[in-house]
């Protein structure tokens, strides 16, 4: 049974998750009519195994899963949805609303997450002498599955507490959604919008273009790229990115492309095919493209567009660790696509040990990297990288591809938040200093346009009354 409601209070938002201070661990609590909803339930993911474990455990204690009446999920990236496993493990019994079509991929994501949690628990015990039982186990997958409710896009749907939920396409990744929550309070109706992660420029045939949110009293909006240097022209810079990929394939021996398993890996395969760069032949054969990620492998097999790149590219899908090790230790000319994109986990780290020391190799980054990740260190010129306790020399060639990100860039954020209508905009999902500056700039722009909308940079644990 869902949690019982108790007490009465004026409706408010509580910025409880890590997305109030950074770009990971998304969760915002909505309180109304004695109901407690969570919008997103993500995991905190940085480059510190022990710190992440403790942060996720502490976040769950703050959320108090047993008191949650419902959860609204915007999309399936781990930092937005895989905290569901820890929540049900701690007793949450609540309906979980997700965009239509999401269930097959969510199940794959959860199965992979449970394996990683178990592995991380062993690492903390063996390497750090810390007893840290997994925050969730295999049985918790079924607990999540039994509470899932798929909600169609564009349909006002009644949910727990008498509220109504409408999903709008976000343009971020497959099945990604913005959410609008309509809450009846006395004789009035409050409308709260959540952009989640979004992109205003379509980049993949599997992702419908963004639908602007309707007028809302409050919008909780992401601003990942609130740094004004994060500007690019999709048409011009995609051409540049394709030229970089083409040149790298012909110039370097081994190319590592760290990426997220969901959406990014598939987008990279699509670009590799369309650039025709992989038609470079060695001994009469196209150079191999390795997709080395168990999660990406399973998502690839379940992808809605039934991508079949085995025939288009010399694509080799790697599932077992033994196969991965053979690829890592080989010196053949190859392109290796492996997770994770920020190099805070996954097989990309194992490949990195072999790729970095050799100046004949290259690393091509294709997305955002938080300041506390290995990807950030490398992108910012670090010549020595600590990998699994070993100091590795970085002699490889490093490139950053700007147009693969599934987030809106600085200019697109500015344009979108001027386009939609709201009384208040609460900014989340950004490095805090950038978010504050972005809020000031946007507020000044709105004032010059004669608009009365207010913009605030949400702070950790802040409550905002509706």
Which role fits each region the language model picked out?
Residues 110-173, 305-332:
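Metallo-beta-lactamase
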Residues 118-122, 127, 300-316, 372-396:
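Acidic, Ser/Thr-rich peripheral helices and adjacent loops at domain boundaries
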Residues 20-25, 32-94, 98-146, 200-208, ...:
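Pre-active-site segment of Zn-dependent metallo-hydrolases
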Residues 233-237, 313-325, 341-344, 379-384, ...:
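A general structural motif
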């Amino acid at each position: 049974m869902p949690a019982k409601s108790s007490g009465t209070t004026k409706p408010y938002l509580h910025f409880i998750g890590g997305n109030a201070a950074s770009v990971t661990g998304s969760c915002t609590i909505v309180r109304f009519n004695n109901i407690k909803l969570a919008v997103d339930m993500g995991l905190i993911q940085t480059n510190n195994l022990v710190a992440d474990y403790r942060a996720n455990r502490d976040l769950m204690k703050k959320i108090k899963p047993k008191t949650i009446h419902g959860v609204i999920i915007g999309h399936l990236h781990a930092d937005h949805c895989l905290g569901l496993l820890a929540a049900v493990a701690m007793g949450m019994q609540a309906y979980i609303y997700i965009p239509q079509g999401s269930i097959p991929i969510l199940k794959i994501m959860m199965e992979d997450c449970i394996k990683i949690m178990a592995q991380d628990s062993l690492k903390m015990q063996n390497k750090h002498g810390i007893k840290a039982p997994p925050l969730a186990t295999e049985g918790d997958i079924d607990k999540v599955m039994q509470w899932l409710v798929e909600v169609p896009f564009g349909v006002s749907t009644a949910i727990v507490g008498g509220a109504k939920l409408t999903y709008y396409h976000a343009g971020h990744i497959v099945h990604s959604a913005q959410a609008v929550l309509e809450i009846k309070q006395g004789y009035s109706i409050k409308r709260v919008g959540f952009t989640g992660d979004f992109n205003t420029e379509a980049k993949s045939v599997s992702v419908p273009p963004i639908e602007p949110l309707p007028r809302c009293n409050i919008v909780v909006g992401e601003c990942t790229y609130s740094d004004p240097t994060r500007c690019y022209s999709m048409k011009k810079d995609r051409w540049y990115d394709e030229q970089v990929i083409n040149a790298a394939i012909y110039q370097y021996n081994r190319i590592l492309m760290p990426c997220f398993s969901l959406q990014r890996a598939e987008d990279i395969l699509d670009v590799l095919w369309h650039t025709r760069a992989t038609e470079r032949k060695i001994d009469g054969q196209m150079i191999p493209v390795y997709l080395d990620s168990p999660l990406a492998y399973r998502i690839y097999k379940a992808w809605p567009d039934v991508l079949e790149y085995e025939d288009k590219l010399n694509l080799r899908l790697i599932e077992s660790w033994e196969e991965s090790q053979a690829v890592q230790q080989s010196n053949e000319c190859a392109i290796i696509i492996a997770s994770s994109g920020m190099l805070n986990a996954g097989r990309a780290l194992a490949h990195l040990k072999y790729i970095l020391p050799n100046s004949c190799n290259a690393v091509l980054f294709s997305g955002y990297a938080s300041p506390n990740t290995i990807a950030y260190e490398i992108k910012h010129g670090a010549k020595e990288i600590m990998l699994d306790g070993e100091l590795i020399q970085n002699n490889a060639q490093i490139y950053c591809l700007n147009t693969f990100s599934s987030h809106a860039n600085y200019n697109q954020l500015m344009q979108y938040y001027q386009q939609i209508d709201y009384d208040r905009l609460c900014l989340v999902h950004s490095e805090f200093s950038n978010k504050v500056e972005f809020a000031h700039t946007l507020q000044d722009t709105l004032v010059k346009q004669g608009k009365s909308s207010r913009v605030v940079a949400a702070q950790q644990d802040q409550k905002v009354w509706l």
